[in-house]
Amino acid sequence: MRLLRLNSSHAKMVLTSLTFVLAGSLPAQTTPSAPANGNLTAVPDASTSSPASGNATPPPVTTNGTTVLPDIVVTGREDDLVGTADSATQGTVGAKEIADRPVMRNGEMLETIPGVIITQHAGGGKANQYFLRGFNLDHGTDLAIDIDGMPLNLPTHAHGQGYSDMNIVIPELVQGITYEKGPYYAANGDFSSAGAAHITFFKSLPEDLVSLSVGMYGYGRAMFASSTAIGSGNLLYGGELYHDDGPWTHPDDYQRVNGIATYSQGDNDLGYSLTARAYHGTWNSSDQVATSAVDSGQIPFFGSLDPSDGGNSQRYSVQGEWHREDANSSTKVNAYAFYYDLDLFSDFTYFLTDDIHGDQFEQKEHREVAGLNASHTIYGKLFGREMENTFGLQVRNDWISDGLFQTEDRNEINKIDTNPADPNFGQVIPATIKQDAITQTSAGLYYENKVQWGEKVRTVLGLRYDLFNFDVHDEDPANSGDKLESLPSPKGTIIFGPWDKTEFYLQGGLDYHSSDARAVTQTTNPDASPIGGTVNGLVPTKGAEVGVRSSAIPHLQSTASLWYLHSNFDSEQLFDNDSGIATTDGQPSERYGVELANYYTPTDWLTLDCDWGDSWAYFDRPDGDGGKMVPEAIRQVVSAGITVHDPSGWSSSLRLRYFGPRALISTGAAYSSSTSLLDWQVRYKLNEHCEFTADVFNLLDRRDHDIDYYYQSQTSPGAAPQTEVHFHPVEPFQMRFGVNFRY
């Protein structure tokens, strides 16, 4: 077929029509531009005008009394990284790629990273569940996420270790996402074993923006952003109001308010920025439900077994950034502080423990955080070869108050264990299960060396050293304690090439994630079950990877990688945030897989992309069920799309997302279903100031599962407990319509 060679408007109309009916496509991968300063620094941040990454917005220019903001240069997937990237699985997603994707939930922006899957098993205000590289990452355990250098992950969180809530992000203000996968980057510390995503926000806008949208199931959203010159700098401010009920029989009634203000000054060589953010959200929670409850007609497909589940959360932050760069060196400093709280009500087992009052519980948290990131890079030569030496420091302190309580209809209440199979059958379960005051302090030092040894050989060597202090004050003095731990993490990469616009990568490294501080010091469980001894607060991982990146075919960016990761989880004490119970049942596991990504732009109006990955995850030895498969570990994932931009103002994007079946228990006796979704976006630019949008989600109205679990529950009082699949359904076919005003 010669269609891709046509330049006529007729060909564009044909391909625009094709997006209405096609589910697949060709190629995908995200890539940023080469560094402008000619140094060895590989993938720059998502924009050449991002103060958070050491590149500030240039100062405004005044002409004839009118202040004009500078042009903003955004990098993206089509950029060629051959010769600059340190890995085949490193890249940048630009604002244009994010805008061209139909996104139902903010967290789905991260699905622009090849291999990442985002799901949800509860109400919209709860953090998403992340999957990558053979991991069910829960709410962020091994995926480090930051916004303008401020960490999003929360250690020792009331609900889950490394909890990362993307609801604080306003998508239109995201300038780009830079990502790295694997334990090979000295600057990435806690929670980065599977990967890291760095989200960069605009510091100025070329024009003001107002966006209004409405849709099915009670969806509505209003957003505005404005950028203006103040003195020799720029002030950007914006906000968002959001509401969504969802298709659930008991509406989510998710309400979200976001606000941001950023003042920036300077240029790429010298500048700073100050940013304040605020987020508040409240919601009802449509938690996962038992398959038998749906099959028997007890509840409908979009029903709930405990309609009083839900929660609320707030996060308020301030941060400042300063940078400078010259021909000899560069320095970046980023300081931040934020307040966070969460009040979450959940019920996953319904009446298994107490068939009178039910099994709902509350997880409550208040947290204050302060931290600093600083790095200094020296540009020089080694035996006449170009060299960079980077020295970095990252410090953080979390003051945390966590609580776990028994509740009914969101009211704290004493309960009675009515399950004859429980060792505490007939005993009173107090309303307060566990309360802790925690101070967690971390400091990370790192060094990275880059040398261009010859025309075809580069190396990147790094060493990171982390120090953590876990200080826990529990209501039970036996579970209180103060523990200091440290861990070195060497890393290395060799890059060969390029030959014919193709280069090869060989990587290896060590990394880690921190344990929940309560697990580090806990010696007795709320149910008096044994723990089995103390364990490490820092859980090491090690990995290796071989990869290739090529732009040999014109307009096609392609990468391929084979990777391996081993997690030493037998040194980790597992802490169940839902029960307050700690065990030493963790055991080491290994994961390995393959990833292919392609991004093809044959013309300036057509983009085709496709990512594919497969991974395998096994315990080193059989677990208690007798199997070696890691439950819920991600297997196959496919993301593919076709995007057309017509000069007449029309654009369209059709995307396919496939999330393959996963073993739900180690023996493979129970598997999840696969999920295949087709989403479609159409945009029409009426003029320079007005644009209309339409997003269609789950175009084929498939009744798939967003996520699956396998465990025991009891769906009603007096019913027999069942061990079965529990699932949260994907949302059905729905449409959202919007209008954007720029002025």
Predicted ranges, named:
Residues 150-181, 200:
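Short acidic/polar hinge/loop motifs at secondary-structure boundaries
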Residues 271-277, 311-474, 554-562, 601, ...:
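Face-selective signature of the C-terminal outer-membrane beta-barrel domain
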Residues 321-323, 330-346, 497-513, 519, ...:
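Membrane-embedded beta-barrel scaffold of Gram-negative outer-membrane proteins
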